[in-house]
């Protein structure tokens, strides 16, 4: 995606370099300029919604969770109303982000679901409105339940 943004896009783009490196996505994933992408089978009951580096953890988690798929947001503002059509039959939606809860993308996503009549159970996994102390990326992801194992445990209702 970095190559696409730097060399192929005709419009302005923002490139960010996340601390700890870029996410590793499934080999068969290809960015197609859509507002969002589905990774896995969207007929499953559980959806993990995310963006950025957290996509890697979610993709790892769905390998261990039989009834889940990933919805990767490529565009976070404005959110596409087409998302509601994809999720209308989903039973549980977990929104995972490395951002704060209050005013974050997950709050906007919950509003989109509500406004479009998506009646799935919704859980927002993120950083509560608090100061995040300096630490390694891996330790912070674990602390805030955003690492792959925590995501597996959340989906399997162990957390």
Where are these regions (language model features)?
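Internal gly/pro-rich beta-alpha loop/helix module
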Residues: 1-7
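Thiamine diphosphate
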Residues: 7-159
């Amino acid at each position: 995606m970095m190559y696409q943004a730097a060399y192929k896009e005709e419009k302005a783009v923002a490139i960010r370099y996340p601390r700890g490196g870029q996410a590793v996505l499934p080999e068969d994933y290809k960015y197609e300029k859509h507002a969002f992408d589905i990774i896995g089978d969207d007929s499953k009951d559980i959806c993990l919604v995310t963006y950025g580096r957290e996509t890697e953890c979610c993709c790892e988690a769905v390998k261990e969770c039989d009834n889940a798929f990933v919805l990767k947001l490529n565009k976070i503002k404005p959110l596409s109303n087409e998302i509601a059509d994809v999720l209308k039959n989903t039973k549980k939606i977990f929104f995972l982000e490395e951002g704060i809860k209050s005013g974050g993308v997950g709050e906007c996503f919950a509003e989109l679901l509500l406004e479009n009549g998506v009646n799935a159970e919704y859980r927002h996994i993120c950083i509560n409105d608090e100061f995040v102390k300096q630490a390694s990326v891996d330790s912070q992801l674990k602390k805030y339940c955003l690492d792959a194992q925590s995501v597996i445990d959340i989906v399997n209702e162990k957390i």
